[in-house]
């Protein structure tokens, strides 16, 4: 049984809850990622922000990413997975919520991120197509 902690990207970089969408966009560019966890001063997960959120929900609506806080786009409780959950649980969670990445939580602490690609690298070749299809619906 492969666990989320075995395939996740450790030490996920957070954008802080007081930062702007422009700060988040620069951090995404620098890290070459499409999503970032939003963390509070206690380094606990407060939400998620994606490059698509910034474009569609801020810029396309006439918003100013240099003055709009990241928490403006955080919606509800973020979907997460436990560090000791099996990757099949991660896959099912991604499929149910139509997301490609999940924050990995151990207790209340953010310990990493797991992506569709992380899971695909650890699946038999014949299962990869099923993964992509399930998440892309």
Give names to the regions the model predicted:
Residues 28-31, 36-52, 94, 102-117:
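A glycine-centered beta-loop-beta connector
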Residues 14-32, 39, 81-98, 105, ...:
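The conserved cystathionine-beta-synthase
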Residues 1-11, 50-95, 110-137:
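Tandem CBS (Bateman) regulatory domains
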Residues 7, 25-27, 41-43, 61-63:
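Short hydrophobic/aromatic-rich motifs at helix boundaries and adjacent loops
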Residues 64, 99-102:
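Residues in soluble alpha-helical coiled-coils and helical-bundle/repeat scaffolds
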